[in-house]
Every structure is written in structure tokens, then in C-alpha cells.
From Swiss-Prot:
InterPro entries: Dof, Znf_Dof. The gene is DOF4. Residues 102-117, 125-161 have a biased composition (Low complexity). Zn(2+) binds at residues 47, 50, 72, 75. This is Dof zinc finger protein 4. A zinc finger (Dof-type) spans 45-99. It comes from the Eukaryota. Keywords: DNA-binding, Metal-binding, Nucleus, Transcription, Transcription regulation, Zinc, Zinc-finger. Transcription factor that may transactivate seed storage protein genes in developing seeds. It is found in: Nucleus. Induction: Induced by gibberellin. GO terms for cellular component: nucleus. Pfam families: Zn_ribbon_Dof. GO terms for molecular function: DNA binding; DNA-binding transcription factor activity; zinc ion binding.
Length: 282
């Protein structure tokens, strides 16, 4: 390990010696500002208006060190060294504006049609409630008199109220930029729907002929009837010609004659070609 060795002639001068004592003495003379870093505190600048020292430094005007700008917290004003003093306080919260009599009268009068209509409604309510109060007061004395004095006709508003309401309605109708009868919106896909309907629609019927074919149709019907008649007569003649040999044959071979059926079948004449009469033929 490294060992510290004392230097002859400097013992007690570096740490805790005469040098340390000199440093403490100098700091005590300069004050607490020197202990914090050696920067002296700025001198308090007096306000040129109120001579108050409650001021602070703001900045240098145009970065010029000869024109510092300060602010006075007492009179709330700025000033620049070498400049002109202006009597303009900072912030307008301290000043109070005075209201004129015309503005107060305008504020008290109804300025909008809605306020006029509200006043008219209040007047009508007051006029409607006055007969009720009178009838209620008389009801304390006699119930029958109260029932007899019940108002039968509603209170009618005054002419001034009607004029105010008409004026409000006219102003609202004239100043309304949006019409009340708005047409319904058109469908967005109207063209596409029409195109799809035209694609899937059935084909149109064929056009009607220019000339009429009523007489030609009748002629065709007559020709068809003639052809059918010829076809029906021709097969009948051929059939008769073909059946001529069969008609010329003797009909007795297909008939039993006068012999009863039982005697004919039991006589054995029809079984002469059978060699063994004991054989049963189905």
C-alpha cells in the first residue's frame, strides 16, 4: 500500500494549518455569499416612480448590458434604464369599468323574442291566478258563494301581449334560415337499384306484326280439315279391302250352331284329334 509521508517544512500548513485559518478569515469578512460560491448578491434597485426596493431584474433590452429592464412589485410597472417611463400598469384586474345608464336600461329591457314571450306567459299566468285567489278568499266565508263566483270565461291577454307575440313569431319566421318543409333525402343507390332491376327484368314481348293474318289463319284451318277428311277416308277403304277374304269365309266355323254348348263340348267331336281321351288338356 502507498504510504503518505510528511514533507519537511509544510507540516500543518495544508490541512488545518495557517492556510485554513486564512481562508476562514477571508470568508468571514466577505459574508455568507462567498461561502456559497463567491458570487456577490446584486444590489437592490429602487423604482424610479415609488422609490421602492421591492423590485426584480427581468432581462436586458435587445441584449444590451447597458439597458437592463426591471419590474417593481409595489406599483406593478416595468422600466428600462435609459428609457422613457410610461404610466401603464401590468394587468387590468385592478381597474373597474363604469356602466352607463343606457346599457343598464338596455339590459333590463327584453332584448330577444324569447324574453318577450316569457314575459307574456308570466302576465297570463298572473291574470289567470288572480280570479282563483279571489274565489279562494270568498270560499272561507261561504262555500256556495265560492261555487257561484267561479270564473267561467278564461282571461284574455292584452293587446300589447298579442302584438309582442306576433312580432316574435314574424321575426322567427323571417330570420329562420332553414325551411321547415325539407324534402326527403333521395336514395343513395337509386341508380344502381334501377340498373339491377333492368338486368333481372324479363325480356320484352315480341313486337306485333304490321299486317293482319286473320284470313290466312282461316284458310289454313280449311286446308287442315280437308287433309284430315282424306286421311280418314283412305284408311277405311284399305281396311275393307284387307278384310275381304275374311268376310268371304264361312261363318259356321266360328259358331256352335243350334247345339247347346254342353252337348257340343261333351259329344267328343272336338276331341277327335286327341289320341288318348284320358289325357286332360287344360
Amino acid at each position: 500500500m502507498q504510504e503518505f509521508q510528511s514533507i519537511p517544512g509544510l507540516a500543518g500548513r495544508l490541512f488545518g494549518g495557517a492556510a485554513a485559518a486564512d481562508i476562514r478569515r477571508a470568508q468571514a469578512q466577505q459574508g455568507p455569499a462567498s461561502r456559497c460560491g463567491g458570487i456577490p448578491s446584486p444590489e437592490a434597485v429602487k423604482c424610479p416612480r415609488c422609490e421602492s426596493t421591492n423590485t426584480k431584474f427581468c432581462y436586458y433590452n435587445n441584449y444590451n448590458l447597458s439597458q437592463p429592464r426591471h419590474f417593481c412589485k409595489s406599483c406593478r410597472r416595468y422600466w428600462t434604464k435609459g428609457g422613457v417611463l410610461r404610466n401603464v400598469p401590468v394587468g387590468g384586474g385592478c381597474r373597474k369599468t363604469k356602466r352607463s345608464g343606457s346599457s343598464s336600461a338596455a339590459s333590463s329591457a327584453p332584448s330577444t323574442p324569447t324574453a318577450a314571450t316569457d314575459n307574456a306567459k308570466n302576465q297570463r299566468r298572473a291574470s289567470a291566478s288572480s280570479p282563483r285567489s279571489s274565489s279562494g278568499g270568498s270560499g272561507n266565508t261561504s262555500p256556495t258563494a265560492a261555487a257561484a263566483t267561479t270564473p267561467t270565461t278564461p282571461a284574455t291577454p292584452s293587446s300589447n301581449t298579442i302584438a309582442v307575440i306576433n312580432h316574435a313569431t314574424t321575426t322567427t319566421t323571417t330570420t329562420n334560415p332553414f325551411p321547415t318543409d325539407v324534402p326527403p333525402p333521395a336514395p343513395i343507390f337509386a341508380d344502381q337499384a334501377a340498373a339491377l332491376a333492368s338486368l333481372f327484368a324479363p325480356p320484352p314481348p315480341p313486337p306485333l306484326p304490321v299486317f293482319s293474318f286473320a284470313a290466312q289463319a282461316k284458310t289454313e284451318d280449311g286446308i287442315a280439315s280437308v287433309l284430315l277428311a282424306g286421311q280418314t277416308t283412305a284408311p277405311t277403304a284399305a281396311t275393307v279391302a284387307d278384310m275381304t277374304p275374311f268376310t268371304s269365309l264361312d261363318a259356321g266355323i266360328f259358331e256352335l250352331g243350334d247345339v247347346p254348348p254342353a252337348a257340343y263340348w261333351n259329344a267328343g267331336s272336338c276331341w277327335t284329334d286327341v289320341p288318348d281321351p284320358n289325357v286332360y288338356l287344360p
